[in-house]
């Protein structure tokens, strides 16, 4: 079974392409800002007519369409590869029950499940791509951020640049910095709406895409487990294990449960509880969960494998194979998580909280690298140096924090194609 680090590496090319398209769009706008700033006001109409012809927006839309096709193809292939790996890990259960373990490609029920999940994950990606926009401050009320399509954002910035070029008595670069900062701070985002409250939610598109892919991977892993469990007659599940688990799932990871017991926290599981399982020795309540050794846990609201949970469940034959981790190993994982790290003049963080902070720092580094690149392409050396200083500062803080926590520095998560350090 592929671990989290291996999956991270597998999905990284898809994420990098998503980051690259963000910088492609920012780069086109930046180059036009530079060109407008360098041309004489009397000749501006020549460049303005070219920009208003829509050629830049057409190029952007073409690249977005190409990206979508490639991303969809790679996402579907990734889901299939993950499924094949997950299926192979279940061979020992088929062998134990003396059931033929047919090749992955010939297991029709499994293929149908994998195809459905791959299609759904791709569909979600397409929906994310359709809902992309910049979040720009309202000129009348700067406190309000409004979603603005890429084409409308382009036109607005070009209009501002033309006006700044034609207005006497102002410094062009200074005038354009406000607009550039907004684009850099926003980046291309996935925008969604709450129809009941009317509120707008947004997050960087590369972050949303990453979450979509991980959701698809979890779904296909669980789908394979559910289907294979039916095929070899599973009577229980084992919850997967990873370092630094979230607090609500930390205690149960690595433990085995009967299907009847597990249905308390996952009633919609496609493996139905086996009524023949004897659970009479367990005290059945709505808020208590028992593993196969009779240990008691509080029932939790967030289901396994949902809402950014990295766990899923293996289908198992209870009493046939021992859990993948001993109690001693599971305790060591929880102890490492709780040991955590205490920053100077700050509250103690669990290792789970440290990893969350690490992800935030990686996103911040990518963001300021975007800024340095856009400022460079716009010909604003002062702004580029300002963002470079931020890159240097945030990278140093990231390395220091990771070292203090004992976490691995993941340079591939801070990489931005095309970025070159100024100093």
What residue spans do the PLM features occupy?
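N-terminal leader/targeting and assembly helices and adjacent pre-domain segments
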Residues: 1-184, 188, 328-423
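Intrinsically disordered, low-complexity coil segments
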Residues: 139-149, 189-202, 263-298, 334-347, ...
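Flexible, gly/proline-biased loop segments at the beginnings
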Residues: 152, 163-237
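Acidic, glycine-rich two-metal-ion catalytic cores of nucleic acid-processing enzymes
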Residues: 203-319, 326-328
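Intrinsically disordered, low-complexity acidic/polar segments
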Residues: 320-321, 374
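Amphipathic, soluble alpha/beta structural segments
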Residues: 321-323, 352
């Amino acid at each position: 079974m592929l671990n989290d680090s291996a999956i991270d590496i597998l999905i990284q090319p898809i994420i990098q392409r998503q980051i690259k398209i963000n910088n492609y769009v920012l780069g086109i706008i930046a180059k036009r800002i530079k060109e407008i700033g360098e041309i004489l006001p009397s000749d501006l109409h020549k460049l303005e007519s070219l920009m208003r012809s829509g050629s830049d927006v057409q190029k952007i839309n073409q690249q977005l369409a190409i990206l979508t096709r490639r991303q969809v193809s790679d996402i579907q292939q990734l889901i299939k590869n993950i499924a094949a790996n997950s299926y192979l890990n279940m061979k020992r259960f088929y062998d134990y029950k003396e059931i033929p373990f047919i090749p992955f490609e010939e297991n029709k029920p499994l293929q149908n499940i994998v195809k459905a999940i791959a299609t759904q994950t791709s569909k979600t990606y397409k929906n994310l791509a359709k809902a992309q926009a910049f979040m720009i401050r309202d000129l009348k009320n700067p406190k309000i951020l409004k979603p603005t399509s890429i084409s409308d954002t382009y036109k607005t910035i070009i209009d501002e640049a033309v006006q700044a070029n034609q207005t006497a008595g102002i410094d062009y670069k200074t005038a354009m910095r406000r607009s550039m900062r907004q684009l850099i701070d926003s980046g291309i985002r996935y925008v969604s709406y709450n129809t009941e409250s009317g509120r707008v939610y947004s997050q960087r598109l590369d972050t949303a895409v990453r979450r979509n892919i991980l959701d698809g991977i979890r779904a296909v892993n669980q789908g394979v487990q559910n289907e294979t469990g039916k095929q070899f007659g599973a009577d229980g599940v084992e919850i997967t294990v990873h370092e630094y688990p979230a607090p609500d799932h930390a205690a149960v990871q690595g433990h085995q449960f009967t299907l009847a017991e597990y249905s308390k926290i996952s009633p919609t599981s496609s493996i139905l509880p086996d009524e023949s399982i004897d659970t009479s020795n367990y005290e059945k309540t709505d808020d208590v969960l028992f593993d196969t050794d009779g240990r008691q846990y509080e029932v939790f609201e967030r289901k396994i494998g949902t809402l950014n949970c990295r766990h899923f469940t293996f289908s198992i034959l209870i009493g046939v194979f021992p859990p993948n981790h001993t109690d001693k190993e599971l305790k060591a994982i929880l102890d490492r998580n709780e040991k955590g790290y205490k920053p100077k003049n700050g509250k103690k963080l669990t290792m789970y909280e440290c990893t969350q902070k690490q992800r935030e720092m990686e996103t911040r580094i990518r963001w300021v690298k975007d800024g340095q690149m856009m400022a460079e392409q716009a010909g604003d050396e002062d702004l580029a140096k300002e963002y470079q200083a931020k890159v240097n500062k945030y990278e140093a803080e990231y390395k220091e924090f990771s070292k203090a926590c004992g976490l691995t520095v993941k340079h591939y998560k801070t990489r931005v194609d095309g970025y070159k350090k100024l100093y």
